[in-house]
Amino acid sequence: NNKFLDITLKNDNNNKKKYLEIYSDLPRPLLSEYNFFKGLIGGTLTFSSVIELTETNSKLTIENFKIKNAPGLVKLLSLADFGGLADLAEGEGLSFEKLEMIMNNNKGFLKLEELYAVGPSISVLMEGYKESNGLISLRGTLVPAKNLNKFISKIPVIGKIVIPKDVGEGLFGVSFKIKGMPGEVKTTINPIKTL
């Protein structure tokens, strides 16, 4: 099958830190405990983490993957009235070119400092936290049709005024909030947001 998994752990005894690095072209089993990654297909994963006594700072990157039959994402797309994308997510899956996630874990409090995922049909920006008791609180923006926004950004004057330079940001989006305890998570949508 020619799948690879490379794990490196280095100790820095002077600074009381450990450095963990993981590379794999089979990311799904490594992320199976996280609901957010249910339905992940394919992709290559790079994960790096600096582990201190009570705190861990990590960065996760996944490239060239699909999300298929992920209930949370399908629900979010349906609530946002992106019906066609919800159907695609349930059918052949939504493609993404890149996902990057930066997080900090301090004594069981997980802070998602930034998550962005960029794909040809939709991009996602998100931040939030998960408490040690299981409570999650996330907020973010869904931006459909990256290609349309790319097209507009190429119009010299309009593009500079309207389109921010950040990856994943576009002209029109939908803001969302996800909050609650496991099994009682509520999702709310703000239907139209101009970024």
Question: Language-model segments: which ranges?
Answer:
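Gram-negative outer-membrane assembly/targeting C-terminal domains
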Residues: 183-195
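Small-residue helix/turn framework positions
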Residues: 1-179
